[in-house]
UniProtKB/Swiss-Prot annotation:
InterPro entries: Rbsml_uS13_C, Ribosomal_uS13, Ribosomal_uS13-like_H2TH, Ribosomal_uS13_bac-type, Ribosomal_uS13_CS
Residue ranges, annotated region (Disordered): 91-118
Protein name: Small ribosomal subunit protein uS13
Complexes and interactors: Part of the 30S ribosomal subunit. Forms a loose heterodimer with protein S19. Forms two bridges to the 50S subunit in the 70S ribosome.
Top-rank taxon: Bacteria
GO terms under cellular component: cytosol; small ribosomal subunit
Keyword terms, alphabetized: Ribonucleoprotein, Ribosomal protein, RNA-binding, rRNA-binding, tRNA-binding
Metal-binding recorded as keyword: no
Record-linked Gene3D superfamilies: 1.10.8.50, 30s ribosomal protein s13, domain 2 (4.10.910.10)
One MF term in the entry's GO annotations: tRNA binding
Underlying gene: rpsM
Length: 118
């Protein structure tokens, strides 16, 4: 198994799909990485040489991925909550942040129903 950005990349998958197992790299970004490194998208990771895997590693290090990206996201949410913005309050209360209705929907964000005690 190849190890890129601290993640074991599955050997049996094609390069484009295997790179998406890294948090922060989707299909489009993995296609751009393959084009920039000159590696064909349909080639499996197990068929790549060590030099090609090293070029993939170098290309991935140019992006914010994995732990750094997770930390960046949590810090930006924490910053919104500390500033007391509307979005921060919605995060703090566990409600939808982007303007969705909450009267009937939003069960995923709000959690299971709480019974009304009589």
């Amino acid at each position: 198994m190849a190890r890129i950005a601290g993640i074991n990349i599955p050997d049996h998958k094609h390069t484009v799909i295997a790179l998406t197992s890294i948090y922060g790299i989707g299909k489009t970004r993995s296609q751009h990485i393959c084009a920039a490194t000159g590696i064909a998208e349909h080639v499996k990771i197990s068929e790549l040489s060590e030099e090609q895997i090293d070029t993939l590693r170098e290309a991935v290090t140019k992006f914010v991925v994995e732990g750094d990206l997770r930390r960046e996201v949590t810090l930006s949410i924490k910053r919104l909550m500390d500033l007391g913005t509307y979005r921060g309050l919605r995060h703090r209360r566990g409600l939808p942040v982007r303007g969705q209705r909450t009267k009937t929907n939003a069960r995923t964000r709000k959690g299971p129903r709480k019974p009304i005690k009589k």
